[in-house]
Amino acid sequence: MAPKIPLNVIFLGTDEFSIPILRKLIGCVQRVRVVSAGGKRQSRRGEIPLPPAAMEANANGLEYIKLQDGWKNFHMRPDDQLAITASFGRFVPFKILNQLPYGGINIHPSLLPKYRGAGPVYSTILNGDRLAGVTIQTMDSKQFDKGKSLAQAYLKLNGKETYTLLTKILSLGAAGMLEHVLLQSLYLPNCQTNTVAPQIHGRITDTGGLQLISKETFPSFQESWAKKITPEDAHVNFESMNTQQIYNMSRAFNHVWCILNNKKVFLYDVHPLHSTSAEDWIHMKPGEFALLEKNLLLVKTLDHVMVIKGGIRLSARKIVDPVEWGKTFNSGRGGRFQYV
């Protein structure tokens, strides 16, 4: 086993994206302290669970700090050296970064400057991109995602990735790339170049592996912004949206929602239908849904037809099988989903 890098890290992370990165740090640096925001309440009466990063810290016997009332309960240790953030969601104050000998680095799941902001993975899927990626950069003391790029790796997409799968692959690739950054001491100011371009370039495999490549073969990207996602982004309009748009929404959120009989209805795992003749659905209007041969629940889009595979949920009820629901709703005669 290779000796650990003599580095004391404050790791700031929250969700599943941060887990492979934290595990990599545990294996390759001298000491890790974990800082996270609180988890999200799963129900109105339920307790707030620990976020994934906190549970991983506990499982490995690491010191864990849950931020409360801003940063008031966070205290530096004299031997803290470097902050590393991954899907943390908060700005690290200058007074903290300024006390660390090596400042901080951030791991962002996009090919910066493309998709600066809060929702890069969602934007990648919603826009139907064919490339995703990860950037490791220094932390800027004034703005998100504006530091100096240290390393970048891209991933070729097949157009079927879900948010969960894409996040997992990118986080595994990011973990591998972070190890190269630390081994080459790129967190040290005197090891950073004055150029904008990253010093490490890579390609992420579809299993999350990392292959280093030359900068000459690395694509370039225009600056853009990834907005913060809201529930409205999963609101589907079958009358104005084409099949690909809706499929991208389903891949991003695992569901879309619309209105049926003046109530919200959630449709899970919605896919384009490829295996039947157009005669089976050509008569349908956008938004109309019907059973096909009693084993598929179809819904018509602006340009084609889709099948609801994962289930249907009405308001606060449980998810039910789409075919069984289709057999009972309106006596099996179908209906029409509305936007409003």
From Swiss-Prot:
Catalytic activity: L-methionyl-tRNA(fMet) + (6R)-10-formyltetrahydrofolate = N-formyl-L-methionyl-tRNA(fMet) + (6S)-5,6,7,8-tetrahydrofolate + H(+)
Record SUPFAM superfamilies: FMT C-terminal domain-like, Formyltransferase
Cellular compartment(s): Mitochondrion; Mitochondrion matrix; Cytoplasm
GO cellular component: cytoplasm; mitochondrial matrix; mitochondrion
Entry's Gene Ontology BP terms: conversion of methionyl-tRNA to N-formyl-methionyl-tRNA; mitochondrial translational initiation
EC number(s) from the headed UniProt entry: 2.1.2.9
Family per similarity comment: Belongs to the Fmt family.
Protein known as: Putative methionyl-tRNA formyltransferase
Name of the gene this protein is made from: fmt1
